[in-house]
């Protein structure tokens, strides 16, 4: 696994290569961003978590950081995903109006050579295989 200066990540095994990157933008006039991206790793396993704290500012930042940190730490330490999610769900406040947890997340879990993707209220991930990707041509 290699990290680059642009907050990216490159994972290679058995001839496969996966690249990840992220960019977070603060809302206008906000000092803190409501998105949090955490990477935890050991000798064989890698966990990437993206969390989005609903709303903006300090509250969104704290909740997304708490969510990403809890999930990445528990999963890299072999806690089952459903148990980790329950622990996070018990910790996060719930919006009384929308009845939603105040943070969403996506987890990408590399265990040895197996990769799992878990999503909770985030937009669907878009897997791209460049061997099967047809790019539009300019005409």
Model features per residue range: what roles?
Residues 44-56, 117-120:
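Conserved beta-strand-loop-short alpha-helix elements that form
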Residues 2-11, 41-48, 59:
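Membrane-embedded alpha-helical signal segments
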Residues 2-11, 33, 63-129:
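Catalytic core of PPM/PP2C metal-dependent serine/threonine phosphatase domains
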Residues 132-139:
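Single conserved hydrophobic/aromatic residue that forms the stacking wall/gate
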Residues 1-31:
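Regulatory cytosolic signal-relay segments
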Residues 30-41, 133:
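Acidic loop->beta-strand submotif enriched in PP2C/PPM serine/threonine phosphatases
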Residues 16, 43, 112-114:
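Beta-strand-turn-beta hairpins that frame and shape the catalytic cleft
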Residues 32, 50-51, 59-62:
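Short, glycine/acidic-enriched capping/hinge loops at junctions between secondary-structure elements
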């Amino acid at each position: 696994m290699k990290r680059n200066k642009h907050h990216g990540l490159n994972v290679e095994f058995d001839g496969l290569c996966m690249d990840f990157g992220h960019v977070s933008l603060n809302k206008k006039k906000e000092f803190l961003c409501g998105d949090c991206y955490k990477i935890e790793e050991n000798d064989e396993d890698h966990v990437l978590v993206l969390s989005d704290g609903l709303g903006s500012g300090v509250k969104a930042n704290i909740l997304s950081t708490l969510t990403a940190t809890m999930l990445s730490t528990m999963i890299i330490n072999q806690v089952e995903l459903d148990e980790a999610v329950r622990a996070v769900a018990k910790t996060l406040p719930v919006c009384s109006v929308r009845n939603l947890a105040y943070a969403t997340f996506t987890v990408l879990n590399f265990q040895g050579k197996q990769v799992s993707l878990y999503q909770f209220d985030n937009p669907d991930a878009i897997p791209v295989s460049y061997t099967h990707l047809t790019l539009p041509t300019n005409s």
